[in-house]
From Swiss-Prot:
Keywords associated with the record: Cytoplasm, Methyltransferase, RNA-binding, rRNA processing, S-adenosyl-L-methionine, Transferase
UniProt KW RNA-binding keyword: yes
Full protein name: Ribosomal RNA large subunit methyltransferase K/L
GO molecular function, one term: rRNA (guanine-N7-)-methyltransferase activity
Database matches in HAMAP family: 23SrRNA_methyltr_KL
EC primary class: transferase
Keyword S-adenosyl-L-methionine appears in the UniProt entry: yes
InterPro entries on file: 23SrRNA_methyltr_KL, DNA_methylase_N6_adenine_CS, RlmKL-like_Mtase, RlmL_1st, SAM-dep_methyl-trfase, SAM-dependent_MTases_sf, THUMP_dom
Subcellular location: Cytoplasm
Originating organism: Cellvibrio japonicus (strain Ueda107) (Pseudomonas fluorescens subsp. cellulosa)
Pfam families assigned to the protein according to its UniProt record, in alphabetical order: Methyltrans_SAM (PF10672), RlmL_1st (PF22020), THUMP (PF02926), UPF0020 (PF01170)
Length: 751
């Protein structure tokens, strides 16, 4: 049965909590102050109690009514069937929040609610329940706002931020769910997915460290709690709960068994605080993976025991209110900025502070600021990309020479750059100059469309000039961990026909190589050049070169973040022409069972999962692409428990499948003779049988999306006459591919 629930959280976490609930499977989510309403079944409520890193409470509303008098409150509560929720011999506790003219004291309000419940149960059975101040059988939550009371069962019991691992704490500890929200805002899930490290130079009792490890190892935050509020509720389903706990224990085991768990380390100058952090880490059973040690901030630097090319430095420095404390903190912030600039180039850094103005002392320019509340203290998370173009003069530096030098250095660099640009222009051939003009014209036209539609990757040029037969795609990518976006270009030169001699073909390619960096004003290192040919067998999966993986980056497409590799394979990991299809899948996927056949890097599955799919299954024969898909899921914080990847011949898999799916994407290659396939795949010849098999796996009300890139493909409508078929090809061609409307064809097929 579907119910509406309310997840309470600290102010500032509402948007993140909404996304988390959607990822857990919640529907009809609605954000409000300090919480999110959502719909789901009891299994989802249990899952949320176990897996939410951000919520304080999960409440099941029973009733809401007007309260204009004490009698209204008593009668409104008493009329509910409390015998359905609590045994008359059980124990009860009421949590009452809010006042109005009739109920001026929360203790009095709690007493009236308690009296009404007790009287109801006594009238029903002749027995009255006990009142328990700790660990009751039923915790009732009553919230009065103006004259409206919302009465709920508190399924969580003790606040969910109490994970169970914190035995000791520092002088001003962060609540665990606030720490988790800060980590998410700081981009830790993405950094961890890339194998980046987390370092906290002022770790206190280790809350950031433990919460970061729970995320990286896929450990449910509620797994260490002693109890929840629903366990002695009369409607409790212990079978559901035990299944969820077993799943969580299994995921924890798998997560901690990973050989590539990120490095997580903390430091603090106070040895007593370090000991408290160590005890908490042991309590969380993470002492084999987390390390804390006593270290002054002045000693803070990148560890050398293993390679750490990138990562996240995250800290919550001390707060101060008195003048002397503020002045000391200015120096502390300045020193922290110096440590970051000197020791962690290329990293990301986050500083959570109740004194945001102090961030200006760090000599770094924050690229993002997020507002939070630490209890009642308005706070901010300041995020920094640690590279020279965000370095600014610290307010505590003694004079202005640094600023003057930097201005002079920048002017010199601009002068050199301008001279190099002039040299490039002089070296362009007439043909290359024509190509430059076309690229710049196309970019001007497409950039407006791309910005309006939040498109970060698009096709700039597709053999617009026949003598320069190439496709040029632009990618606005972020290298880990979330550095400032940079522009990259992917150039695919189509093989010249035999009628064009090799010398002329070579000259045209040289023109392209000269024109692209000049027209786009990007470094050559950001451009990948390839020649597109029809590949055979496994060659389509072979690496083209051994360029370091550090050059990989991610792009944002809708809600999804996707890994891109411009250099090592023929394709980049993302087929740009299918962008509208992926967006369509994201919009169609909520609560659907999604199957992705010939899934490639599973980008459509990521969109489906981010769109609220019940679960996804992605099938492909290439282990290379499935590993890539795993990275895409991890990049978006999506678990393989609900997003299964299967290495198989898709045709054989379909023949043997007995599962039903509500949404299927069938996007096969036009031709394949891979050694792993028993037969050669020819899409024109084989599509009817393939679609019939896919339709057997489609639920009665489901939708099959069938697409392919064979230019002269003809769908056999007569052989597929039993189905409802809609050609949506025109709707799946975006602005950047309108020059080539035959880039793919696409149909919706239903029973």
């Amino acid at each position: 049965m579907i119910h509406q629930y309310f997840a309470a959280c600290p102010k500032g976490l509402e948007g993140l909590l909404l996304q988390e609930l959607q990822a857990l499977g919640a529907t009809d989510t609605r954000e409000t102050i300090a919480g999110v309403y959502f719909n789901g079944d009891l299994n989802l409520a249990y899952r949320t109690c176990l897996w939410s890193r951000l919520a304080n409470k999960i409440l099941l509303p029973l009733a809401n009514f007007e309260v204009n008098s004490q009698e209204d409150l008593y009668e409104g509560v008493r009329m509910l069937p409390w015998q359905d929720h609590l045994s008359p011999s059980g124990s009860l506790l009421v949590d009452f929040v809010g006042t109005n003219d009739a109920i001026r004291n929360t203790q009095f309000g709690a007493l009236k609610v308690k009296d009404a419940i007790v009287d109801c149960l006594r009238d029903f059975s002749g027995v009255r329940p006990n009142i328990a101040k700790r660990d009751p059988d039923l915790l009732v939550n009553a919230r009065l706002s103006k004259n409206k009371l919302v009465l709920s069962i508190d399924l969580s019991g003790e606040s969910l931020h109490r994970r169970g691992y914190r035995l000791k704490q520092g002088s001003a500890p962060l609540k665990e769910n606030l720490a988790a929200g800060i980590l998410i805002r700081a981009g830790w899930p993405e950094v961890a997915a890339q194998g980046g490290a987390l370092l906290d130079p002022m770790c206190g009792s280790g809350t950031f460290l433990v919460e970061a490890a729970l995320m990286a190892a896929d450990i449910a935050p509620g797994l260490g709690r002693a109890s929840f509020g629903f366990e002695r509720w009369l409607n409790h389903r212990n079978d559901l709960w035990l299944t969820l706990r077993e799943e969580a224990h299994h995921r924890r085991k798998l997560g901690l068994a990973k050989v590539n768990l990120p490095e997580i380390r903390g430091y603090d100058a106070d040895v007593r605080v370090v000991r408290a952090a160590e005890e908490n880490i042991i309590s969380a059973e993470l002492d084999h993976w987390l390390r804390v040690s006593r270290k002054e901030l002045a000693e803070f630097k990148k560890p050398t025991h293993r390679a750490m090319d990138y990562g996240l430095v995250l800290s919550n420095p001390p707060y101060g209110e008195r003048l002397g404390e503020i002045e000391s903190l200015k120096l502390l912030y300045a020193h922290l900025g110096e440590r970051l600039r000197n020791e962690f180039p290329g990293w990301r850094a986050g500083v959570f502070t109740g004194n945001p103005e102090l961030g200006k002392q760090m000599g770094l320019r924050a690229d993002k600021k997020y507002k939070f509340f630490n209890g009642t203290i308005a706070s901010e998370l300041l995020m920094f990309s640690i590279n020279t173009d965000v370095f600014v003069q610290s307010r505590v530096e003694q004079d202005g020479r640094f600023s003057k030098d930097e201005v002079e250095r920048d002017a010199a660099e601009q002068k050199v750059k301008a001279a190099a640009k002039e040299e490039q222009a002089a070296a362009l051939s007439n043909g290359a100059q024509m190509l430059v003009n076309r690229l710049q014209k196309n970019r001007k036209q497409l950039e407006k469309w791309a910005r309006k539609n939040e498109v970060s990757c698009y096709r700039l040029y597709d053999a617009d000039m026949p003598e320069y037969a190439a496709a040029i795609d632009l990618y606005l990518g972020q290298t880990p961990p979330n550095r400032a976006p940079q522009l990259y270009a992917h150039v695919q030169e189509y093989a010249a026909p035999k009628s064009v001699d090799e010398a002329r073909a070579a000259q045209r390619f040289a023109d392209i190589e000269a024109a692209v960096p000049y027209a786009l004003d990007i470094p050559v290192s950001h451009i990948s050049y390839k020649q597109r040919r029809r590949n055979k067998g496994s060659s389509q999966y072979e690496k083209l070169n051994e360029r370091p993986t550090g050059d990989l980056f991610s792009v944002q497409e809708g809600q999804a973040k996707l890994h891109i590799n411009l250099w090592q394979y023929l394709d980049t990991g993302l087929f740009l022409d299918h962008r509208p299809v992926r967006h369509m899948i994201a919009n169609m996927a909520r609560d659907k069972r999604f199957l992705n056949l010939f899934c490639y890097t599973a980008t459509a599955s990521v969109h489906a999962a981010m769109g609220g799919a019940r679960y996804t299954v992605s099938v492909d024969m290439s282990n290379t692409y499935l590993n890539w898909a795993r990275k895409n899921f991890a990049l978006n914080g999506l678990s393989e428990a609900r997003n299964r990847l299967e290495q198989a011949d898709c045709l054989k898999w379909l023949e043997n499948n007995d599962q039903q799916f509500d949404l299927i994407l069938l996007d096969p290659p036009s031709f394949s003779n891979s050694k792993r396939m028993e037969d050669i795949l020819d899409i024109q010849r084989d599509h009817v049988e393939m679609i019939h098999n896919a339709m057997r796996s489609l639920s009665e009300e489901g939708t099959l999306i069938f697409s392919n890139n064979l230019r002269n493909f003809k769908l056999d409508l007569e052989a597929l006459g039993a189905y409802n078929i809609e050609d949506i090809s025109a709707r799946t061609i975006d602005e950047d591919f309108k020059r080539n409307p035959k880039i793919h064809q696409c149909w919706l097929i239903r029973h």
